[in-house]
Amino acid sequence: MKSTIYKIAALTFAVASMSACSLDEYNPSQKTGDEILATFDGLKGLQSYCYSSLYGQLFSVYDFLSVAEGGTDCWITPAGNPDYAKQVIYYDGLATNTNATNKLFGQAYSMIGNCNAVVNRAELLTDGNEKDITTLVAEARCLRAFYYSILVNTYGNVTLTLEESSQDPILTPQRNSIEELYTQIIDDLKFAANNLEDTPYDNNRARVTKKTALGLLARVYAQGGGEYGLTEEGVSYWQRAKEVAEDMILAYGDCLYDDVEDVWAPANNRNNKEALFIAAGPDATNLENWNAGTQCNNNFTYMYPKPNTL
């Protein structure tokens, strides 16, 4: 009996002790996504993810490469499988459900949603210094312009959205005009060029820089001028492309290799001066290709010119 009484008393004391403890303990796992993204570190983490498609799929597997350059006389199907990727190499059976085009479309818009979140949430940050925040936003806008330039160059007048992704899908998207798309792309790239440094943020070679923004800006001007005859304040996009390209060359010393063989030289593979930026993977200090599978080694075996024999 005494043993039972002692056990009950001990249990009662333990319960009373627990009820007396403070319930205001800090539990970081209870923070909401909005709370995390209201901090500089949280937003920086999301901003880093804006790069993920570059090393994850766009430049490490065949899909984007086949969409970007398929249909030209530079590419052929592999000898042992003439039907492989024929939809994008020969436009044989190309349809809306072709995997390569679907993957590119979905990944570009996914990254655009992340870029939009960074741009829009930067004003809500509760910490961080202004220069670092501006740099992250400039990078996000540069990447957003890059992804939109891929979309408009591949699919024409797509839907322009500057809002982050939500749980509710838009079932009736509306196409924007080519002029609206190029105006936004150019506005983003001008902002990036004015706010990024010559050296990458955190000395991370995978991050975009002023050179990236200016190079993309010149290319976008050339695309808009050549494909659609666009103008800006009465000036041809072609003229704008020339001005930006000359600015890059004269002010920043950007140039091409004298010998095209140097473009493909192994010694220049990870530090190529013609590159606008590097799809380096999540660890930019690792010089190995993070997401290269065995299939990646075959990509250029489908290329007729054989650049490694130049």
Language-model regions, residue ranges each:
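Bacterial Sec-dependent N-terminal signal peptides
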Residues: 1-29
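Aromatic-lined, polymer-binding surfaces characteristic
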Residues: 148, 157, 161, 204-213
